[in-house]
Amino acid sequence: MNDWHRIFTQNVLVPPHPQRARQPWKESTAFQCVLKWLDGPVIRQGVLEVLSEVECHLRVSFFDVTYRHFFGRTWKTTVKPTKRPPSRIVFNEPLYFHTSLNHPHIVAVVEVVAEGKKRDGSLQTLSCGFGILRIFSNQPDSPISASQDKRLRLYHGTPRALLHPLLQDPAEQNRHMTLIENCSLQYTLKPHPALEPAFHLLPENLLVSGLQQIPGLLPAHGESGDALRKPRLQKPITGHLDDLFFTLYPSLEKFEEELLELHVQDHFQEGCGPLDGGALEILERRLRVGVHNGLGFVQRPQVVVLVPEMDVALTRSASFSRKVVSSSKTSSGSQALVLRSRLRLPEMVGHPAFAVIFQLEYVFSSPAGVDGNAASVTSLSNLACMHMVRWAVWNPLLEADSGRVTLPLQGGIQPNPSHCLVYKVPSASMSSEEVKQVESGTLRFQFSLGSEEHLDAPTEPVSGPKVERRPSRKPPTSPSSPPAPVPRVLAAPQNSPVGPGLSISQLAASPRSPTQHCLARPTSQLPHGSQASPAQAQEFPLEAGISHLEADLSQTSLVLETSIAEQLQELPFTPLHAPIVVGTQTRSSAGQPSRASMVLLQSSGFPEILDANKQPAEAVSATEPVTFNPQKEESDCLQSNEMVLQFLAFSRVAQDCRGTSWPKTVYFTFQFYRFPPATTPRLQLVQLDEAGQPSSGALTHILVPVSRDGTFDAGSPGFQLRYMVGPGFLKPGERRCFARYLAVQTLQIDVWDGDSLLLIGSAAVQMKHLLRQGRPAVQASHELEVVATEYEQDNMVVSGDMLGFGRVKPIGVHSVVKGRLHLTLANVGHPCEQKVRGCSTLPPSRSRVISNDGASRFSGGSLLTTGSSRRKHVVQAQKLADVDSELAAMLLTHARQGKGPQDVSRESDATRRRKLERMRSVRLQEAGGDLGRRGTSVLAQQSVRTQHLRDLQVIAAYRERTKAESIASLLSLAITTEHTLHATLGVAEFFEFVLKNPHNTQHTVTVEIDNPELSVIVDSQEWRDFKGAAGLHTPVEEDMFHLRGSLAPQLYLRPHETAHVPFKFQSFSAGQLAMVQASPGLSNEKGMDAVSPWKSSAVPTKHAKVLFRASGGKPIAVLCLTVELQPHVVDQVFRFYHPELSFLKKAIRLPPWHTFPGAPVGMLGEDPPVHVRCSDPNVICETQNVGPGEPRDIFLKVASGPSPEIKDFFVIIYSDRWLATPTQTWQVYLHSLQRVDVSCVAGQLTRLSLVLRGTQTVRKVRAFTSHPQELKTDPKGVFVLPPRGVQDLHVGVRPLRAGSRFVHLNLVDVDCHQLVASWLVCLCCRQPLISKAFEIMLAAGEGKGVNKRITYTNPYPSRRTFHLHSDHPELLRFREDSFQVGGGETYTIGLQFAPSQRVGEEEILIYINDHEDKNEEAFCVKVIYQ
């Protein structure tokens, strides 16, 4: 509730001039105004001399030139410091508003305000000038549409000068206005239609900043924080209210009697003549209910009719209107006003500033005139008037989803959302003795959020009580009749529009105008056809539904009812695209190398891995099961683990026989544990002489490091790197986590082509064999399948893949084995030093309780030093410029007083002048032998002595002035505690601070934090769970903190009481951690230094400060946190290739929850809740449950950048409600590529050209493609790309198969091995018409192949040349790739079928193309391998 009151009180608007409110209403127009910078010496020199620390800001207000009236609310920019001399002041602040007063005389006044401190320390604010910003042109219906920069001229004086009667429009041409020379404000003003969907959240004529948080709008994406540039509405929540009871004390009868008596007295005192109190009657008791966001009503409030509690059963037979004075016949004993119907509020939003406003109104009327005679219906309508008597506000966020609520009613002169006078609250001046001693009344109701069922709802219909008219009253007017008279309204009109079927008060009653005070005074008639107050139309363009409509609804009332569209209810989410199942892209099989491969590896001369005793490490089999004993790992005497990764060989598989080129060089990327992501150097693939033809499991190529000149190193082959994981790296208690990481996690390795920079594939290896289990060293050799994964487009894999409600099978993901990686992993144990071992045995719980007992305290000494205690009593002279530069500069001001403040020497000048003075005195002393110079020396010494006396006086005055500040800053060290946290991405670091009240009096301590990533744990259950996970046994207190909305939490401390304040630090930002990737810090086999994660200075460090302020505002404790961010564990890596400057939408399906590492055994029942967070705020990442018992999907929506940008971010998944420890951490890479769409025919050549744009320097480049058999480029080899030039790259595409798929094309700098450009060629290929079909049976297995022949007849009368192609070049070869045949002649085509290793069927297409490579015919050969 505090949020609503705060926003409501801070955004009170001054309404436009009443004459503007009477004009016809027009549609509101939205604008965006960007105040860029201020040029020129706006701030006078005299102001800069009088004030210190001068700052500047702008103020913007609306002004009506016609009526000389300021309205709306003054908006202020952020304060910017000024420089001497004044130069350009940059603001760059966006300003938004919308208004329907599109008249040229409606302008915005921009005022330049300077503020600074006077000599006595008080703050002084001065107006330095103003400008008139014209919003609309001379044509009222045409706003300024130019969006280019404009300059606003500034005038001397303040905007209050516009109120002077001598200033006539145009004010800019008035002789009393004086321009400020060479001063202007740069700005842009343009319409902003994107703000129209948020009009209901922003009142008209309200100036708001794009950086301001608007209740009902989602925060902006990115770092700009401008939520109004593209507003995004929050999801609404439907609320229902039932059984509303208004209780007015001491009773409803007494309350209404006194209300009528006071109305009669007020009527007589205002000089309107006597009025019989018995003749005044209550027509209706109405309730207005609306949703308010602190700025204004979101929709026009609903209007319903209340009835006395005792009259509920009589409303169908008795008349509703009655005379209050006859209490014996009506409401005797009635204690409450009741609403029988249900209220539906579909515009609620889950925001602390959204509240429901209840307004209780009474409609009065007198059936007799002033002279006592019967009045006509017209006079009755004129005498009707409505008054608000009570109101209440309720914030649903503070309650549960359903329940009963009791609210106190408010009244009196305090501000309310309708900005009108309210009947006063009970006071001592009341005439009734019972009213004096009771409250203002209460409101009780039952509520439910997001539910359509009634809560204890009555059996009557939802519609309100039917109103029966008296026979003497005239029926309501028809829609064609002129509207009833409506009094003038200045602020927040509440009258409902006239329509058929409404009650009599709906036709005649309206809110009382502040300019009319007499109840019986008739208002002036509105002319026929004119509209009511336009302010009500501009604030509420649609009338809310009214519950007291009669049964005979006419067409107008039906339009009223249907104009308020109900909010559509969201159905359970069902994905239409195929999600990626976690694990499918890294399902490479791993095994142990064969004995033949081991012979080749051993004979190649790879370095041997030795333990600490220089003995070979124990070799374990990668296929043997591993028994993990955590106690055995922790009790190991070798506390340090040296992790060794040896990349040995990369072999080609026999299945990869499509004619694709084999890479010459490769490099690997991966991330091990919390170490920075690693990228190995380029390694040469050297073919073994003994390898021969590739077969299943055969070793073909070994890895050799490449030197700088491009040749491979003749030394030992392979590449080796080491990671040292010891007590110096691991945090206290982290060793068990590292052992569990080795036991359950897999290491994913990406293999890249070192020349084309294309991804070859990925491999995954389990690390459980690295657990030493008490052994000195272990090593395991692995043979890993390198798998390439391709993701099809979502629109290609939709149909036919739905398995049930919310289920999609993992289609659209194709994997191909590209090769086999031979890798050796080893773990070598080392003993650690004794001092390091001592710090590693610190219990984890000790570091989670921070006490200020050991804080440094001031121990005396100079105030100019750092205050640190010295063990040795040694006083060493220091340079004054080093100790206090300000004092050193002051000591030299006497010599330059006449040159102005701009010539004050700097620190270096002060030091240099002092040295010159000392040198001069030394030379004068050396010349003491000369009698003539001796007198000069004496005069110089006297001058120096006089100068020293002056310096001492300046020093004494300066020390006296800064003594209080220096003492206070040094004494604050006594209450300051410093602590260092080692945080990881997504992990909540929990700790407690022991706070003690050092005073003899109780205090309410406010906890102020300057870092949003650090927060106080205010939920006791969350505190309890964190303590249980950390193993702390300190007490937990319920309701420890007093929460005040968005303000800082408070807690109460008794004298000398100690309390444990719980904190948690959690960071989801990984922006600077990406810098660590540039310096992996790897070491090869020749440099055996282990990798240390702290060698790189790119590891970011954050700081947070917590201030504990007592009741008087003085701090009693200060906690300074230094947060050292550490690299984190990555469980899964995803790589997506997507067209540039578009959105990637992907769904990643989670496997069953019990299969995740670390899940409890037997957890097969209800899955825990899944929460997801992303390190990039510009990425939309969410999770939804598809249905009961269905799997969960993680949805990503990422905007790709320009090509060839690579965007990486982390997705963090939690399974606990407090988001304490991530269950999974994924790293997602998005490669932005230039998209090229190609529609072609299989087997036929399609040509296109790509434009290459040169960079700043000359580059030698080459084009590489992922499918060289299907896509060829011209130039084919290396060519020169001129600087800043344009060159064409010719591309020929011949797809071998029909279908849709992606082909990657990279342009690489061959000298620097950098990616210059990259394209994503999207092929949409159709199959040609098959003219002939053949069938052949072949034997599977080893063989020489089979030769066959088919004939082809030239259908043309002339001689033609034809070219032959096949969609399976590895299975079918032609005797001749092209042939010539005469017109009408027949040619025999020779075919050679290669043997196949597996049994099955294969359809091979033969494409016969003409001389232009267009398809003439296509044959299909069905091969059956037996």
Swiss-Prot record:
Chain positions found as Phosphoserine: 142
Documented effect of changing residue 740 to H: Does not affect interaction with RPGRIP1L; does not affect interaction with RPGRIP1
GO molecular function: structural molecule activity
Keywords: Cell junction, Cell projection, Ciliopathy, Cilium, Cytoplasm, Cytoskeleton, Disease variant, Leber congenital amaurosis, Nephronophthisis, Nucleus, Phosphoprotein, Senior-Loken syndrome, Tight junction
Signal peptide bounds: none
Composition skew (Pro residues), residue ranges: 474-486
Outcome following mutation: residue 91 to L: In SLSN4; also found in a patient with cardiac laterality defects; impairs localization to the ciliary transition zone
Consequence the record notes for mutating residue 754 to R: In NPHP4; affects interaction with RPGRIP1L; disrupts interaction with RPGRIP1
GO BP of this protein: actin cytoskeleton organization; cell-cell adhesion; flagellated sperm motility; negative regulation of canonical Wnt signaling pathway; photoreceptor cell maintenance; photoreceptor cell outer segment organization; positive regulation of bicellular tight junction assembly; protein localization to ciliary transition zone
Reported impact of residue 883 to M: Found in a patient with cardiac laterality defects; uncertain significance
Disease as annotated in the protein's UniProt record: Nephronophthisis 4: An autosomal recessive inherited disease resulting in end-stage renal disease at age ranging between 6 and 35 years. It is a progressive tubulo-interstitial kidney disorder characterized by polydipsia, polyuria, anemia and growth retardation. The most prominent histological features are modifications of the tubules with thickening of the basement membrane, interstitial fibrosis and, in the advanced stages, medullary cysts. Ciliary dysfunction leads to a broad spectrum of disorders, collectively termed ciliopathies. Overlapping clinical features include retinal degeneration, renal cystic disease, skeletal abnormalities, fibrosis of various organ, and a complex range of anatomical and functional defects of the central and peripheral nervous system. The ciliopathy range of diseases includes Meckel-Gruber syndrome, Bardet-Biedl syndrome, Joubert syndrome, nephronophtisis, Senior-Loken syndrome, and Jeune asphyxiating thoracic dystrophy among others.
Name recorded for this polypeptide: Nephrocystin-4
UniProt source species: Homo sapiens (Human)
Higher taxonomy: Eukaryota, Metazoa, Chordata, Craniata, Vertebrata
Gene of this entry: NPHP4
